[in-house]
């Protein structure tokens, strides 16, 4: 699993904002590590600038946005804070 710099900053914000948000994000990251396409919880394929990326809901306001790099067999976490900001 690979985190962009923005995702690393987002993770720090998330951890300081709420223990519940941090726990939910950690749970989702563990699911992504084992199978990025596992359902439930549901995920959404994104379009536009984020085409090729997927989103999972952390809560109403925040999303975990990630890409699956098939050739490298890596999940790249793009964002963890806000809604596609």
Annotated model-derived regions:
Residues 30-57:
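A short, surface-exposed loop/turn module that caps and links secondary-structure elements
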């Amino acid at each position: 699993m690979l985190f962009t710099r923005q995702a690393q900053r987002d993770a720090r914000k998330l951890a300081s904002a709420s223990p519940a948000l941090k726990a939910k994000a950690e749970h989702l990251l563990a699911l992504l590590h084992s199978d990025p396409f596992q359902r439930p919880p549901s995920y959404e394929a994104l379009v536009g600038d984020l085409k090729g990326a997927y989103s999972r809901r952390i809560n109403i306001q925040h999303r975990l946005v990630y890409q699956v790099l098939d050739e490298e067999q890596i999940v790249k976490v793009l964002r963890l804070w806000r809604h596609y900001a």
